[in-house]
Amino acid sequence: MAAEEGKDEAGLDQVEEEFSIWKRNTPFLYDLMISHPLEWPSLTLHWVPSTPIPYSKDPYFAVHKLILGTHTSGGAQDFLMVADVVIPTPDAEPGLGGRDQEPIVPKVEIKQKIRVDGEVNRARCMPQKPTLVGAKTSGSEVFLFDYARLSGKPQTSECDPDLRLMGHEQEGYGLAWSSFKEGYLLSGSQDQRICLWDVSATATDKVLNPMHVYEGHQSIIEDVAWHMKNENIFGSAGDDCQLVIWDLRTNQMQHQVKVHEREINYLSFNPFNEWVLATASSDSTVALFDLRKLTAPLHVLSKHEGEVFQVEWDPNHETVLASSGEDRRLMVWDINRVGDEQLEIELDAEDGPPELLFSHGGHKAKISDFAWNKDEPWVISSVAEDNSLQVWQMAESIYREDDEDEDDDDEGNQNAQHSNENQK
């Protein structure tokens, strides 16, 4: 027992030491770094997909919105939360003050709290109506809230969603809105089911049943995701190590492949390339796949220590993606760099493979969720079990060279495409 306590203390000391080193290096590693302590940890995080508005005190800053939740473990009432994030625009000049000549500091402010039953496992906004939020909690229902409708109204102690979406028997985390079909919401849970609702359909007493239930997984479904180019295709993944591709036109599986030896926790379709997707697994890797050949990965990204819980493609750069795991690290990868030579062999090998662009070490506990900001390239928000919410952007010097290379590649690809078309 004493040995275990000593081991725990040593682990905590190591976390504090690593955090201290990270903090000292922050000015050199980041162009933007906001760290905001939350009253309760949030398991979920999502940028509201609406146009940022100019900040009233300084036109060189803009207000972005974030959706968060609370994870109180029964210690208090739980809420879905809307936050304002004030960050500089790309045109902002360093040290620029507001109208009162006081320097404007990037910040996060919780603006709205909406009562929910149970902890918020995951919350996501409808792309076509950004104020409409789907929320999966520690119960089996999925709640739908229009936070604009509730804005300005007194906060109640009752959970009063616009809709209660039924169909699951257990809680879960998988939740995804279709960017093509307005109102289509997918959910995957521990009951091994995937439910699909059309929230624009007529509900009875604010209760809506699924338009279809998909079954085929043999264990907990960890995640669901829509294809980014084909409105009829979606994917699911779970603890049975299976990646499943489904087609709405037949409501059948297109592919079912065991792609990892341990649980698959997340999947993400590339927003630019219709064939490429990524999976995050408890085997400590992120794997990249071609939909035309799922039997073997295109490439495996390895640097995390422990389970990898999330992977998300950058909405602004085709070859860039990020992943997070139980090692408290959020890693940004650029697959354009796969195979690059490493000059300082020993030093570079310690830093990781050449495709590892950046490793964010600002959290002291497991990262629960993170999100790319589509309106501000290279800006990421992340939340962790240590109650921290961080909004950050790596230093331009880290990615600039890669941006230039990507522009050259894009031009080359376009020329090649024109050449192919001419040959046809």
UniProtKB/Swiss-Prot annotation:
Q: Which residue ranges contain the repeat WD?
A: 167-207, 216-256, 259-299, 303-343, 362-402
Q: Which GO terms describe its cellular component?
A: Cul4-RING E3 ubiquitin ligase complex; ISWI-type complex
Residue spans of biased composition, Polar residues class: 413-424
Q: Where is this motif: DWD box?
A: 233-249
Q: Where is the composition biased (Acidic residues)?
A: 401-412
Q: What is known of its domains?
A: The DWD box is required for interaction with DDB1A.
Q: What is this protein called?
A: WD-40 repeat-containing protein MSI3
Organism from which the protein derives: Arabidopsis thaliana (Mouse-ear cress)
